[in-house]
Swiss-Prot record:
Binding positions for Zn(2+) 2 per the UniProt entry: C61, C64, C97, C100
The organism's taxonomic lineage, starting at the top: Eukaryota, Viridiplantae, Streptophyta, Embryophyta, Tracheophyta
Protein encoded by which gene: FAB1B
Protein's name in the database: 1-phosphatidylinositol-3-phosphate 5-kinase FAB1B
PROSITE patterns referenced in this protein's UniProt entry, alphabetically: PIPK, ZF_FYVE
GO biological-process terms attached to the record: endomembrane system organization; phosphatidylinositol metabolic process; pollen development; stomatal closure; vacuole organization
């Protein structure tokens, strides 16, 4: 009995061994006893080394066959029986060792996981996904392996009786997975396999592989291996084979110039087609199913057509899919249909099937496609591709033309690239790679001829077999790939004990080789080393061995051959073997040595794995040149394959979308040069093509049925022209601005006709110093000689556009896009001005700050945000991430739609809502792509099980049908479109070029004017594009500009002056009439004559003021001139009143003798009493006919009866001397301040000189005051003079004179106690002349002489002018009434250069302006600085802190002192904080005794000299500052809580804000650091957004009668919003505590932080990349400075200027330091003792904390729109950033 059992057992073991060798049988998980380690050679446990005894028995692991003790084999795992229908609970469990048990638990590397057939959603790998293909393999040398250890998986395997390599069996796998995951879902469908060799050959990858879109699993994952000849079959473009691409482009084959670029070209002024409006979403009952989607209001169409709004919220029918274009697509196709596949040789993908070929409508059916269009389309694609390769060859310095005896590289590369691209079908499963560069490798072989170059359908590597006796040529080879090494180690680096190694090494290696041989491989590929014993065993078994293969190469071989990399021999199964039709090893002597190499020829050994079953790897072998040339060609080939591959995918996608296939389009082709330093002379143009005029398309005349007729020309015309291409050298550029209008060309490859945009990959772009200037590049390619050709340089971004013989270089102007159309044809040239206020001169001086890198053009940087419309919450805040085209983080378009939008099991991690509850928004450049999803309850699209994705669109600009935008017929997305890069899909969507956007069959843009729908089952996704406003950033300019146009306030001042003058002259005329009625006719004629003359003078002067010639930067109407005329009218009123009084008293002298009167009119004048000459250097416009000045300064006007008056003042009696050369006034003698003769209180009587004119009948009061009789006088000898300080009299460039007259001096207040009477001027009649007949002198003295005499004779005492205020008018009273109504105070002495600044009691800036122009202020701020005073004790202001503590670490370097120097000698080095050691302030006091009472004004100017120097840098001139400050108005500023006084200057240039005492003390402390920081920022052009403070003053007024006194400290700050139309205004502190304005209505409402945060989800503020960087740099610099100065609680004021798309911003309120009261406030708010939210940080925190919070908030508030294509043109000094700015944002790249 025992013998029989033993025989039976032996027989069964033999049968089992034979069965294990049969390839058709799945091997069980238990290892055959033949592969168990022998008992006698194993004396200790393999794991714990314990000795085996009678008690401690040996136990073999049923999985690896090694011997262990009982403790080490205590685990068991389930074993799937051969009948996979056996229920799981009936599965047998087998004993395994601890290591195998851990492998089973981990599920990686063991057969339990690796044998699972991975299923793919990719339609490229299964007929389930609408490819309608079923394939069989003729390489059936694989047996279906075992699938042991599958838990939860049901598998059924039917074994056929045919055990041959071509046997047939079937397998049906049904894989299900229960449960639903929160953010990922995996479901599988059933599949049938009719061939045992058609198992999944793709390698298994972890489902947990990271994906930047989130952890999603595919819905359907299957893969099948078709026949090799089917994989390598020709691809067809709607029946147009690509395999027959000719090697030479015949002359009759033309290429269309219409570029269907996917690359974003520079935006034109095309506006939004669908602007996202207010979106209301309500979450309804889950069982209702009528979920509302988002509302969209399409507006702002680029033409005049009005688009009706589309109501997404209420129009559920908008989402209903239209009818299918092809009824056959509606049918649910069988899973495998052999007949359907027989005619489709396009392979696994079913690329470009006839049903989904070019175009829409009639072009999708074979019977509706003409051969002419197919041929023309093929010519377009091939022509542009050849042009691209020709350009790349030129970059590599490789000749494009045929050389003697050699074939052109252009033809060879074109053929190889197309062949490789057509064969390539990447693994589109979730774990597969998309990059075609990872599947096609290029090898260089310096032997043979160029035409020997070929595409190997497999892998070629530089390897050889270990032993020469091993086979090097095997047909139908079976490969086994082993990871690690084949040595006596369990796994790599796991060592065993020495004695165990000695005992078991040979036995183990023999068993391992036996296991390998049992699988019958022909070739063994090992990653690392192999033991010598094993090598001998393998040689004996006739197995070729290859060692030390790098892991990437192993992966490629495994991917192509279908093998799996086995970690150890314990996991062997026949299912893991690979296969290739031909394996061989060849040796090639390299005949063409490298340049400079001599001697022995190198022999290169190459190993071939040819005709692999899967099209997942190819090798292009380049031959026929030396190594150096082949390396250059290699770069071109690598890119050529990438370009050809993407060309096919993008073309198919556009065809599916319904892009119009019209050929005659007028867009130039753009070709980008790689990263090279090229100039205009070295630029090349090799792009073939032609231009056919485009007829105007009328949307109402075109229909979907006839998309071709409006724009087509016969194809025969398209194929009629040819040209040769050559490099253009030394072509003179057309100057910009000479009528040329151009358009910027984007540096991207634009594939003609079908929107293929390809950019150089990183591996291709390498800087090479190749001289392209002298090469001729004839290319036998059709093109019209008048074709506009563009060569764009990626590095410089200078687009060069060649049109015939014309040549234009891209303008450097920011925001101006340039395109020069065909010059020969006279095409219209257009300019799209994208930004209104760009300044070319400022841009040209700026260096490119962020140069683009080549990698930028191989990826797209987008911003993504997601929000739940059901809950109204933001699920995913806007963030940046980069998608590299076809890279590891890219996805096929089909998978993105399936995983992200159509996965009904998806639940958002944030809101737990499904995908249809969300709206996703991608932003890039100037547009946003909004994705909405809707679940249809009553409609189901067919083909869900097959994975069909349907496409259609609705045009928003076509006439409505039943109230809805018309829809196109829906089509099934082709397999090639399914595999399109999602990144390229986004690039297509955001591109704003006419070629890229493509026109639909109705003539409108697909991506701009249409809603694009994608449907799958009952899920529909809608993609819609809308333009967004990308704002640039405008920082406070370093030099303030003044707007001199359209200033209403100056017009009002002008009208007031004219009105006063008219009132004066009319009042005088009326008074003259009254005098005439009383009988005083004697003087009436003379009075009327003088009145007419003075009125004519006034009108002439006003005309000169209003119509003067002005230079750039000067006001059209000088307000200071108006002030002077206003003051002159006041004195003219006084003079006319005296004239009329005098005339009314002459009735007693009616009969006087005329001769006597005439003698009295011409009295002799003493030399000491001569009339001073009028200022010769005046440029006053008020000089009329009475007083005219020649350029030499001599008075040539008529002086009336005073014609004997000397024209030069006597130097012994006058106060001043004038220069002989005219104009400049200088003191006659320089005396120190202590030598003033006024110091001696000596009575000085006015003595009447001989011949002095005596005035009669004047008012006694006025006359007494006039000559000083009522005052204590001192007599000034005629030989004494009053000398002025030289610094006062020097001509300061800070104050350009209006009238360079005599500069009066306002003596300090303490010196005004001396009452001095001066000799009366000859122009002023004296009362001492008693002869009444001489009173006619009032008429004979011209008014201007009288006015100037007043200014000259009362320089030293403003009290003399007060006498005018004491005069009571009799005839002329209008001026007195104006004063009583609160008018300006004009009786104050004039300022420097006779400048008149009126003072208004309710306008503090007028007081400041007057003080700044006073001689006293100039004396105190003179260069010597003796009179500068310090008021620390009086003002209770602490001394400034040491400037050394304020030295923020900034990278801008030290201050350039030459930049800070002021032109004036007084202003030199005033900004240097170290030049003064104490706070220097100037105080000016002045007063007026007017009608309203005596008032004293005191103005204290803090840091007067430093502020003056700062203004010298930041302002065009000091006079502009004075003009602006002369008038102001109270301003109700909003947003602040301090309730302090606010005012604005009437020109809106400056803002006046009251400063509290604490703020003033804080500023005084850190003012030196402020001046230093601001000066450094300006000199180094470092970005800063501090709103410049140009002065801080204390203004005090005191009414002497009432004793009322007011004081106010104010600062003068630039108005950041000057000249702006701001719709929204934000005051941002970075805090959320009490930072919300509930009343946001109104145009001037200031919004706060919470208002901005609330608006961000729906209406965010977008800025460009460069603008964001500029903003951050400025904020970083300023906050660092403010924190060092212990300043906090500042704000960023942001105004949104929608007209210019700019953010006008600046930091304000930075005067407050962190003092003890702020400490206390912070503590109270933090603890919440007095109420308020406790969970929010207080607004008042320490400066360092405030800085960090402020920076973070400002970075978050403004969303950056990435745009990697725009040239960097941030201009720091005028704070302009480019309009969509791009992007290589440092630190924001999310990959």
């Amino acid at each position: 009995m025992g013998t029989r059992d033993s025989n039976n057992r032996t027989f069964s073991e033999i049968v089992g061994l034979i069965k294990s060798w049969l390839p058709w049988r799945s091997e069980p998980a238990t290892v055959s006893r033949d592969f168990w380690m022998p008992d006698q050679s194993c004396r200790v446990c393999y794991e714990c080394d314990c000795q085996f005894t009678l008690i401690n028995r040996r136990h073999h692991c049923r999985h690896c066959g090694r011997v262990f003790c009982g403790k080490c084999t205590a685990n068991s795992i389930p074993f799937a029986p051969s009948d996979l229908r056996t229920p799981r609970e009936d599965w047998e469990r087998i004993r395994v060792c601890n290591y195998c048990f851990r492998q089973w638990e981990q599920g990686d590397g063991g057969p339990h996981v690796s044998n699972i057939t991975e299923l793919s959603t990719s339609p490229s790998e299964t007929s389930l996904l609408s490819s309608k293909t079923s394939t069989t393999a003729n390489s059936s040398s694989f047996a279906l392996g075992s699938m042991p250890g599958l838990i939860g998986l049901n598998q059924r395997v039917h074994h056929g009786s045919d055990v041959s390599l071509h046997g047939v069996s079937s397998m049906e796998t049904s894989v299900t997975k229960q449960g639903k995951e929160t953010s990922r879902r995996s479901s599988f469908i059933a599949t049938d396999v009719e061939d045992p060799s058609r198992f999944a050959l793709n390698s298994i990858r972890s489902d947990d592989e990271y994906d930047e879109y989130g952890a999603y699993q595919t819905d359907i994952e299957t893969s099948h291996s078709p026949r090799a000849n089917e994989y390598y079959g020709p691809m067809e473009y709607n029946g147009m084979g690509i395999d027959d691409v000719p090697c030479k482009h015949l002359g009759g084959e033309t290429a269309d110039q219409k570029s269907l670029s996917g690359s974003p070209l520079i935006h034109q002024c095309l506006e939004s087609l669908i602007r996202e409006g207010s979106e209301q979403f309500q979450k309804k009952s889950e069982h209702d199913g009528r979920d509302e989607c988002e509302a969209s209001s399409p507006a702002d169409i680029s033409d005049d057509q009005v688009v009706e709004p589309v109501d997404f919220e209420n129009n559920g029918l908008l989402w209903v899919p239209p009818e299918p274009e092809n009824e056959e697509d509606e049918r649910e196709s069988a899973l495998f249909d052999e007949e359907d596949n027989e005619g489709d040789a396009s392979g696994e993908w079913g690329y470009l099937r006839p049903s989904t070929s070019f175009g829409s409508g009639e072009y999708r059916g074979e019977d509706r496609t003409t051969e002419e269009h197919k041929k023309a389309m093929k010519n377009v694609v091939d022509g542009h591709f050849r042009a691209l390769l020709a350009q790349l060859l030129q970059v590599e310095n490789i000749s494009v033309s045929d050389e003697e005896g050699k074939e052109s590289w252009l033809e060879i590369i074109t053929s190889l690239s197309w062949e490789a691209a057509n064969l390539l079908k990447p693994d589109m499963s979730k774990s597969g790679g998309m990059d075609p560069g990872g599947y096609v490798k290029v090898k260089c072989l310096a032997s043979g001829f160029r035409h020997d170059s070929m595409v190997v359908k497999g892998v070629v590597c530089k390897k050889n077999v270990v032993n020469r006796r091993m086979s090097t040529k095997i047909e139908k080879a079976r490969l086994l790939i082993l990871g690690g090494g084949l040595e006596y180690q369990r796994v790599s680096n796991q060592l065993s004990s020495f004695d165990t190694l000695l005992q078991q090494e040979k036995d183990h290696l023999k068993m391992a080789v036996a296991k390998i041989h049992a699988e019958r491989p022909n070739i063994l590929l090992v990653e690392k080393s192999v033991s010598r014993f094993a090598q001998e065993y393998l040689l004996a078994k006739d197995i070729s061995l290859v060692l030390n293969i790098k892991r990437p190469l192993l992966d490629r071989i495994a991917r192509c051959t279908g093998a799996q990399i086995i970690p150890s021999v314990d996991h062997l199964s026949s299912q893991k073997l690979g296969y290739c039709e031909n394996f061989r090893v060849d040796r090639y002597p390299e005949e063409h040595g490298s340049t400079g190499q001599v001697g022995k020829k190198v022999v290169k050994t190459l190993m071939y794995f040819e005709h692999c079953p899967k099209p997942l790897g190819f090798t292009i072998l380049l031959r026929g040149a030396n190594e150096d040339e082949l390396k250059k060609v290699k770069h071109v080939v690598q890119y050529g394959v990438f370009a050809a591959y993407h060309l096919a995918l993008e073309t198919s996608f556009l065809a599916d979308e319904g892009a119009s296939p019209e050929l005659p389009l007028n867009s130039p082709i753009t070709v980008a040069l790689p990263d090279k330093s090229t100039s205009i002379e070295r630029s090349i143009s090799t792009v073939p093509g032609f231009t056919v005029s485009t007829y105007e398309k009328s949307p109402t005349m075109l229909s979907c049925a006839e998309p071709q007729r409006a724009n087509s020309v016969p194809v025969s015309e398209l194929l009629s022209t040819t040209t040769n291409l050559s490099i253009q050298k030394d072509i003179p550029p057309i100057p910009y601005g000479s009528g040329w209008q151009a358009r910027e060309i984007n540096p991207s490859f634009v594939f003609s006709r079908h929107n293929i945009s390809l950019n150089l990959p990183d591996r291709v772009i390498e800087s090479r110093n190749s001289d392209l200037s002298g090469r001729s590049v004839p290319v036998d390619t059709p093109a019209d000689k008048s074709n506009p050709i563009v060569v764009a340089d990626e590095t410089t971004n200078n687009s060069l556009h060649l049109s015939g013989q014309g040549f234009v270089r891209k303008s450097s102007q920011i925001g101006t896009s340039i395109m020069v159309e065909n010059q020969d044809n006279g095409s219209e040239l257009t300019i799209a001005q994208q930004q209104n206020n760009e300044k070319p001169k400022e841009t040209q001086s700026q260096k490119e700050e962020f140069p683009p890198s080549p990698s930028d053009h191989q990826s797209i940087l987008v911003s993504l945000s997601s929000r739940s419309v059901w809950k109204g919450t933001v699920c995913e805040r806007s963030h940046l991430f980069r998608i590299k085209y076809y890279g590891s983080f890219d996805k096929p378009l089909g998978r993105f739609l399936r995983d992200h939008l159509f996965d009904q099991s998806y639940r958002c991690r944030s809101c737990e809502m499904p995908s249809e509850a969300h709206v996703h928004c991608y932003t890039h450049r100037q547009g946003s792509l909004t994705i909405s999803v809707k679940k249809l309850q009553d409609y189901l699209l067919p083909g869900e099980k097959e994975g069909k994705i349907w496409m259609w669109h609705r045009c928003l600009r076509c006439p409505r049908l039943n109230g809805f935008p018309p829809a196109t017929l829906r089509v099934v997305m082709s397999d090639a479109a399914w595999g399109l890069s999602f990144g390229k899909f986004l690039e297509l969507s955001f591109s704003n070029h006419a070629a890229a956007s493509r026109v639909a069959c109705c003539g409108h843009s697909l991506h701009r004017d249409c809603l694009r729908f994608y449907g799958f089952g009952n899920m529909v996704a809608c993609f819609r594009y809308a333009t967004i406003d990308v704002h640039s950033v405008y920082l406070p300019p370093s030099i303030l500009s003044f707007n001199y146009e359209n200033q209403d306030w100056i017009q009002r001042e002008t009208d007031e002056v004219i009105e006063r003058a008219e009132l004066l002259f009319s009042e005088v005329l009326n008074a003259i009439s009254q005098i005439a009625e009383k009988g005083f006719r004697r003087r009436i004629g003379e009075l009327e004559e003088v009145l007419q003359k003075e009125k004519a003078e006034f009108e002439e002067n006003m005309q000169k003021i209003l119509h003067r010639e002005v230079n750039e930067g000067q006001p059209l109407v000088d307000i200071l001139e108006l002030y002077r005329i206003h003051r002159q009218l006041l004195f003219q009123s006084y003079m006319w009143d005296h004239r009329l009084i005098n005339a009314s008293t002459l009735h007693k002298l009616e009969n006087s003798d005329d001769t006597k009167r005439e003698e009295n009119e011409k009295p002799p004048l003493a030399k000491s009493q001569t009339l001073p000459e009028m200022n010769a250097g005046t440029n006053s416009l008020l000089t009329g006919s009475e007083v005219n000045l020649n350029p030499d300064g001599d008075s040539t006007g008529d002086t009336g009866s005073l014609n004997n008056v000397q024209k030069e003042a006597d130097t012994n009696s006058d106060l001043y001397q004038e220069k002989d050369d005219g104009g400049e006034v200088s003191p006659s003698k320089t005396l120190p301040d202590t030598s003033y003769p006024l110091e001696n209180k000596v009575d000085v009587r006015r003595t009447q000189s001989d011949g002095q004119i005596v005035m009669k009948n004047l008012s006694a009061t006025l006359d007494a005051a006039w000559i000083g009789e009522r005052q204590t006088s001192v007599e000034i000898p005629t030989n004494n003079k009053v000398s002025l300080p030289p610094s006062t009299m020097s001509n300061s460039s800070t104050f350009p004179p209006i009238s360079e007259g005599l500069m009066p001096i306002d003596l300090p207040e303490q010196q005004n106690e001396f009452k001095v009477a001066y000799p009366v001027s000859p122009a002023l009649p004296s009362k001492n002349y008693e002869n009444s007949e001489d009173s006619v002198s009032w008429l004979s003295v011209p008014f201007l002489n009288f006015y100037r005499s007043i200014n000259k004779n009362f320089l030293l005492s403003s009290q003399k002018l007060d006498t005018f205020g004491e005069h009571s008018p009799i005839y002329i009273s209008s001026f007195r009434e104006a004063e009583l109504q609160g008018g300006p105070r004009l009786l104050l002495p004039v300022g420097l250069n006779d400048i008149v600044v009126p003072v208004y009691d309710d306008e503090p800036t007028s007081m400041i302006a007057y003080a700044l122009m006073s001689p006293e202020y100039q004396r105190q701020t003179s260069a010597e600085g003796e009179s500068l005073v310090s008021y620390p004790s009086e003002l209770n202001i602490p001394r400034p802190v040491d400037d050394t503590i304020f030295d923020p670490s900034r990278s801008n370097g030290s201050v350039d002192e030459s930049i800070l120097s002021i032109s004036s000698s007084r202003s030199t080095s005033l900004l240097d904080p170290l030049s003064y050691t104490k706070a220097l302030h100037a105080r000016v006091s002045y007063g007026e005794d007017g009608t309203l009472g005596k008032v004293k004004y005191t103005v204290t100017c803090y840091y007067a000299k430093r502020f003056e120097a700062l203004r010298g840098i930041c302002l065009p001139s000091e006079l502009e500052y004075i003009r602006s400050l002369s008038r102001c108005k109270k301003w109700g500023a909003q947003g602040g809580k301090s309730n302090v006084f606010f005012a604005k200057t009437l020109d809106d240039r400056f803002i006046i804000k009251q400063v509290t005492k604490t703020e003033l003390e804080s500023f005084i402390k850190f003012a030196p650091a402020y001046f230093k920081y601001l000066s450094e920022s300006i000199s180094t052009k470092s970005p800063t957004c501090l709103a410049k403070i140009l002065g801080i003053y204390q203004v005090a007024t005191k009414q002497l009668k009432s004793g009322k006194e007011t004081k106010m400290d104010v600062l003068i700050m630039e108005n950041l919003l000057f000249g702006r139309t701001v719709k929204r205004l934000y005051d941002l502190k970075g805090s959320s505590r009490a930072r919300y304005n509930p009343d946001s209505s109104g145009s001037n409402k200031v919004l706060l932080d919470q208002n901005l945060i609330e608006a961000m989800p729906t209406s965010p503020i977008f800025v460009g990349n460069k603008a964001k960087r500029l903003l951050e740099r400025a904020v970083w610099n300023d906050t660092a400075f403010l924190a060092l100065g212990d300043v906090m609680d500042y704000s960023l004021l942001v105004g949104v200027d929608e007209e210019k798309n700019e953010l006008v911003l600046g930091i304000i309120d930075f005067l407050r330091q962190y003092t003890w009261d702020k400490h206390l406030e912070s503590w109270v708010k933090f603890t919440g003792i007095l109420g308020g939210p406790k969970n929010e940080a207080p607004t008042v925190i320490s400066p360092k904390q405030y800085k960090r919070r402020f920076r973070k908030a400002m970075t978050t508030y403004f969303l950056m729109v990435p745009d990697q294509w725009s040239p960097p043109n941030v201009v720091a000094n005028n704070s302009k950033s480019d309009q969509p700015e791009e992007t290589s944002q440092a630190g924001t790249q999310a990959e």
